[in-house]
Amino acid sequence: MKLDTYQEAAARKILVYGPPKSGKTDLVGRLAEKYKLHWLDLEDGIKTLLHSPRMKKEWMGNIELYKIPDTQMTPAAIETMLRILKGGTQNICHTHGIANCVKCKATDAPYTPINISSFGPNDVLVLDSVSQLSLSAMNYIQREILLKDNFDKKPDWDDYAKQGRILERIFSILQAAPFHVVCISH
C-alpha cells in the first residue's frame, strides 16, 4: 500500500478516568446527542444518567443498555464481554446480564441483542467500568475458592498473570476495533 492511498481509521478509543461522582458517566452520556451508545453497565452507573439535569430525554433513545449485574460470586461481566467481542449476535438477558443465558432462553425471558460486527461509524461501545471488569476477571479466576467461602485466600502471582492475559485479550480487540470505544474507570 502506498502512503498516499492510506486512509486513517476514524474509530476513536477513549478512557474517561476520575474519582467517584466526578461526572464521568454524565460526560459519556452526552455523546448520545450524536452517536448511538451501546452501554455495558457493570456497576449500575446508568442511574446517574436517569437523574442528570444535563441529559436530554431525546438522547436517551440513542442509548442501548446492557445491564450486567456483576458480583463476586457471579462474575458475569468477564464471560459476557469475551462473548460479545467474539462477534456475531449475542443476546444479553435482562435478568442475569449473561450472553445467551440458557436459563432465560428456556423461559423466554427478555433480552437485548448486540452484534459488534454490525457497528458502524456512529456506534460507540461504552464499557462502564473497566475497574469492575478487572475485578470480574479475578473473581472468575478464583471462583472455585470463593464458592468454598475461603475469603482468606489471596490471589497469587499466577492469578494476576491470568487476569492480565484475559484483560490483554479484551483490550487488544477493543484497540483494533473499527468502531468507537469509551471505557470508564475509577
Describe the predicted segments one by one:
Residues 117-186:
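P-loop NTPase motor core
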